[in-house]
Amino acid sequence: MATTRLKTLYQETIVPKLTQQFQYTNVHQVPKLVKITVNRGLGEAAQNAKSLEASLTEIATITGQKPVVTRAKKAIAGFKIRQGMPVGIMVTLRGERMYAFFDRLISLSLPRIRDFRGISPKSFDGRGNYTLGVREQLIFPEIEYDSIDQIRGLDISIITTAKNDEEGRALLKEFGMPFRDQ
């Protein structure tokens, strides 16, 4: 299988640039992408089997991988949830699929967001990982407007080997992540 554009960019351009910027002594110290998780909480749709199926097909279409149904660990009466009920779906992307999805995300999907001025640079977790919330699935070119029954959002978490937010931000910026200026 041919390597993706971003993986080649990482190996040929980003590694030397970050090595020089942070004075790494070894190429293995340079932060890299580990995985991308795409998650959707079902909320009220947990009781509706048709809504669950629609979410499963949408996430599978967006990521190119079959999602896993996450289930409630314990019952919560306030949320009308019993143990074992479906509460969300998620996909973990690694390797070539991860790079292909990330490429589509930053070059095609994010610019399609209405009134897009860049993404917030404040959504790092302190350890170099970034989480992005998407309000509607229509920003992905794989989803057709006529095929959806309801607008639903999803969360995208980008997990890196960076030690802190500064390294993580530098890595994602080099990949072409459109951060908003502060």
Swiss-Prot record:
Encoding gene (name) = rplE
InterPro entries membership: Ribosomal_uL5, Ribosomal_uL5_bac-type, Ribosomal_uL5_C, Ribosomal_uL5_CS, Ribosomal_uL5_dom_sf, Ribosomal_uL5_N
Q: What is the lineage of its organism?
A: Bacteria, Bacillati, Cyanobacteriota, Cyanophyceae, Nostocales
Classification via Gene3D superfamilies: 3.30.1440.10
Q: What does this protein do?
A: This is one of the proteins that bind and probably mediate the attachment of the 5S RNA into the large ribosomal subunit, where it forms part of the central protuberance. In the 70S ribosome it contacts protein S13 of the 30S subunit (bridge B1b), connecting the 2 subunits; this bridge is implicated in subunit movement. Contacts the P site tRNA; the 5S rRNA and some of its associated proteins might help stabilize positioning of ribosome-bound tRNAs.
Q: Which family does it belong to?
A: Belongs to the universal ribosomal protein uL5 family.
Q: What name is this protein filed under?
A: Large ribosomal subunit protein uL5
Q: How does it assemble?
A: Part of the 50S ribosomal subunit; part of the 5S rRNA/L5/L18/L25 subcomplex. Contacts the 5S rRNA and the P site tRNA. Forms a bridge to the 30S subunit in the 70S ribosome.
A Pfam family (short name) is: Ribosomal_L5
Q: Which GO terms describe its molecular function?
A: rRNA binding; structural constituent of ribosome; tRNA binding
